[in-house]
C-alpha cells in the first residue's frame, strides 16, 4: 500500500482536522505504485487537502477470491480500521470518503461502493464493469483457470454474486454518486454502455461520459482530474498556459 498525505501547510490543526480520503485502485498487472509512476497524481494534488490511499490487490479483481486471498474484505473492512490508527485525523464521514479506479480497479470501485455504502462518490475509468458478453472459458485476456480462481463457476454473469447489478439490488442504498468514463475506442466501451444502462434501470445516480480514447494512462489521468473537480474538496485544476 502507498499513501499520499497532504502537505503540512494544508493541515492547520491535526487534532481536529477531518481530512477527506480517496481510495485509488489499480488495474490488472498493476500495483500500489502504478498511479504514482504512470501519472502526475502527486503533483496534481499537491495543493489539495486530501489523503490518497493506493492499495495493492494483485490481479484479484477486488474480490474475496476462490483461492483464499480476501481482497474485498481487506479493503472494505480491515483497511479503514488500519488507516484510522495511522492517520487519526482521516475522516470517518461517508460524505468525505471517495473511491476510484481504472480498468479492473474501476470494477473494484463500483463493487466496493455498491456493497459497503461507505463512499459518497465512486468513479470508474475504462472499468471492466461487466462480463455478460464474454466467455470466460474461452477468451484472450486470461486462462479459464484464472477466472475460476477469482469468480468460481459462473453460468450467468448478470445474476452472479460478482455482477454490479447483484450488488446494487442486494446491498446499495442508492445514495452513492457513480461517475463513469470510458474511451470510445476502448475494448471495454460496449461493456460500459451495457452496465450503465443496467445501473440506471435500478435507480442509481450515474453520471456517464465517453469520448475518443483508448485503454491508456493519458486518458485516465485526465479523467481523474475531471472526477476530482466534482468532489466536495478544495481541489483546483492547476493553471496551464498555452
What function would you assign to each model-found segment?
Residues 1-242:
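Non-catalytic cap/lid and distal C-terminal segments of serine-dependent acyl enzymes
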Amino acid at each position: 500500500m502507498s499513501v499520499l498525505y497532504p502537505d503540512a501547510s494544508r493541515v492547520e490543526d491535526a487534532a481536529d482536522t477531518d481530512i477527506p480520503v480517496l481510495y485509488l485502485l489499480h488495474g490488472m498487472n498493476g500495483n500500489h505504485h502504478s498511479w504514482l509512476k504512470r501519472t502526475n497524481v502527486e503533483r496534481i494534488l499537491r495543493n489539495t487537502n486530501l489523503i490518497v490511499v493506493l492499495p495493492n490487490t494483485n490481479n484479484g479483481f477486488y474480490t474475496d477470491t476462490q483461492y483464499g486471498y480476501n481482497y474485498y474484505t481487506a479493503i472494505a473492512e480491515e483497511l479503514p480500521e488500519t488507516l484510522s490508527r495511522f492517520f487519526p485525523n482521516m475522516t470517518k464521514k461517508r460524505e468525505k470518503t471517495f473511491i476510484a479506479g481504472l480498468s479492473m480497479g474501476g470494477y473494484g470501485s463500483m463493487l466496493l461502493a455498491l456493497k459497503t455504502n461507505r463512499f459518497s462518490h465512486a468513479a470508474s475509468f475504462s472499468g471492466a464493469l461487466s462480463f455478460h458478453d464474454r466467455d470466460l472459458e474461452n477468451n484472450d485476456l486470461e486462462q479459464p483457470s484464472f477466472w475460476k480462481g477469482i469468480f468460481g463457476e459462473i453460468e450467468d454473469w448478470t445474476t452472479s454474486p460478482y455482477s454490479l447489478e447483484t450488488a446494487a439490488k442486494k446491498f446499495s442504498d442508492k445514495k452513492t454518486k457513480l461517475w463513469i468514463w470510458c474511451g470510445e475506442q476502448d475494448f471495454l466501451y460496449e461493456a460500459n454502455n451495457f452496465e450503465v444502462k443496467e445501473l440506471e434501470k435500478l435507480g442509481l445516480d450515474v453520471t456517464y461520459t465517453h469520448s475518443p480514447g483508448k485503454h491508456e494512462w493519458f486518458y485516465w489521468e485526465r479523467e481523474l482530474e475531471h472526477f476530482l473537480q466534482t468532489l466536495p474538496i478544495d481541489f483546483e485544476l492547476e493553471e496551464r498556459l498555452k
